[in-house]
Amino acid sequence: DVQRRLANGEKIDHVWVMFDKDDFSHFEEAHKKIEKLNNSKTLNVERLHYNTKNNIVWHSCWSNESFELWLCLYFCYYQSASKRTEYINFLQNKGIPYKKNLPNVHDILVEKGGSLETAIKYAKKLEKAKGIDNPSTGMYKFAEYFIGYMEK
């Protein structure tokens, strides 16, 4: 999609790459490659070339083990390495009818007593303690960047 947009003359400032570790064996390598894109002059992503003259900033928003960790952090500091099913059970015990791609998930989490600011704080704390090891998530980077738009 980035290549097509650039070819159409669109200006792209940021590319957000979001992914879970789950059973992805190249998780750490993918994270490093995305972060490294900001430091290289010419990028080769799956044989597609982007030149940094476009001033694109690349962001790696990982979740290790899964995205559902980010949702649990709205409520508490969750520092045990867990699987997706455990995170989903935690959310359901909070009364959240969680399913993948749940619309308005942020609003539902807040209605149930969760806080975006809490999730950001705990995600940063996990990253400081764990790096990208399980459990950790870089979703706070996306949230911090767009929080101003959410408040409008």
Q: Model segments located where?
A:
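C-terminal accessory helical subdomains adjacent to catalytic cores in phosphodiester-
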Residues: 2-14, 21-152
